[in-house]
Amino acid sequence: MNDIMRKLTPALAALLFTVSAAGANAKSQPVPAHDPIVQMVTSLGTVELELFPDKAPVTVKNFLNYVNSGFYNGTIFHRVIPGFMIQGGGFEPGMRLKPTRTPIRNEAGNGLRNTVGTIAMARTSDPNSATSQFFINTADNSFLDHHDDSVEGWGYAVFGKVVKGMGVVRKIEAVPTGTRGPFADVPLRDVVIKKMELAGYR
C-alpha cells in the first residue's frame, strides 16, 4: 500500500492545479483577530469551517472576500478523488470557469498540515497562484505540506478545518465521477455550493 501511495502522490498533487482566469478587483474585508466560522450549504448538506487568520492571514482574508461577495454561491465541487480530497470554488455547472481576483501569496509554511478535514488552497504549478479554488482533505496528505521554498517543495496552504459536517464531506467524496471534456474526476451529478456565508466567530 505504501509503495502504491508513493507512486500516486506526485500525480495526485498535480490534480490540485487550477485553471487560470482573468483577475477582477473587489474591496478587501478586514480579518478579525479571532477565528471566523463559515457555513457552506451544499446540495448534499451543510459544512461548517473554522478559519485560522493567525496562521494564514492573507489566505483567510482572500477567502472571506470571496465568501462575503457571494462568489461561491452556485459554484460546484468540480473534482472529487476518494481517499484524497474534494475540490471546488472555481466552476459553475457546465464546468464554466468563473473570473477571479489577483492571486495571493502562498502561506503553506505556516506550520499547518494537510490532515483529514483541513481546508487548503488549490493552485497551479506556480506556488503563488491561488485565487478562489480550495480543497478539503479527506486523508492525511503530508506530501502536500510545505517542505522547502522550492517550486516542488512549497506545498499547499492550509487555512482552516471542518468543525461540523464531515459526514457531508464524506458524502461528496463518495459521489460517482467521470470525465467531462478535458476534466477528469468530475461528479456525474453536480454537487452545488448553494450558499457560503460568515456565520460567526470562535
Question: What do these predicted ranges mean?
Answer:
Residues 2, 16-202:
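Cyclophilin-like peptidyl-prolyl cis-trans isomerases
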Residues 1-12:
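Bacterial N-terminal signal peptides that target proteins for export
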